[in-house]
């Protein structure tokens, strides 16, 4: 059951999985969205806010700022222990603070203005705009972050893209220049006045080329061969997301096994 790497580019990871059931590959995809914990703002306490945004809108924006979470997975308690925590919450929360006032000119507040107690948990990017303050306007707040799962809220999902595609097989049977023009993914090219396949893996099986070049091009998917693509928001490296998603599946299978054995 080979797994091959076809792209590792910063926040993006693409793998080819061969001879795996679609259900298994799709389970990894879903787990990467729903069951890999990352840090995000859970609660916001406003001390002062006379900005153009209501407290609720500003809190929502802060919650969607992704935070680096690699170290958090090692040093903070899991979501199961902290989601409903009211007392004895040590190891659950990190705090960030925002205390900014515009003077005589409008001032844009960015994610880099958030000051974190834990220097290992900071915004993925400091250039995320939060709110534009007018002259003499001020925001002062404290926000609490905890680990959470994407199944709770999308702010806790570590991925912006997690998809499974069928592995394409593209065959040129004739010469049809129109295929180069109509293919949205640039799969084809003309070389020496002949139609050739330039980038087979980019094919999304839309069959747009077949509308104009039926008989000249063959498009099909390879059985039990899939492309898994994961794109991180930056909280975790895509490799870590894949590992944690696989661990979550193993835990769920182990839990299912235990319950089945207990019911015998």
Curated annotation (Swiss-Prot):
GO terms for cellular component: cytoplasm; DNA-directed RNA polymerase complex. DNA-dependent RNA polymerase (RNAP) catalyzes the transcription of DNA into RNA using the four ribonucleoside triphosphates as substrates. This is DNA-directed RNA polymerase subunit Rpo3. InterPro entries: DNA-dir_RNA_pol_30-40kDasu_CS, DNA-dir_RNA_pol_insert, DNA-dir_RNA_pol_RpoA/D/Rpb3, RBP11-like, RNAP_Rpo3/Rpb3/RPAC1, RNApol_insert_sf, Rpo3/RPB3_RNA_Pol_subunit. The lineage of its organism: Archaea, Thermoproteota, Thermoprotei, Sulfolobales, Sulfolobaceae. It catalyses: RNA(n) + a ribonucleoside 5'-triphosphate = RNA(n+1) + diphosphate. It holds the Pfam family RNA_pol_A_bac. Disulfide bonds: none annotated. [3Fe-4S] cluster binds at residues 183, 203, 206-207, 209. Its EC number is 2.7.7.6. Part of the 13-subunit RNA polymerase. It comes from the Archaea.
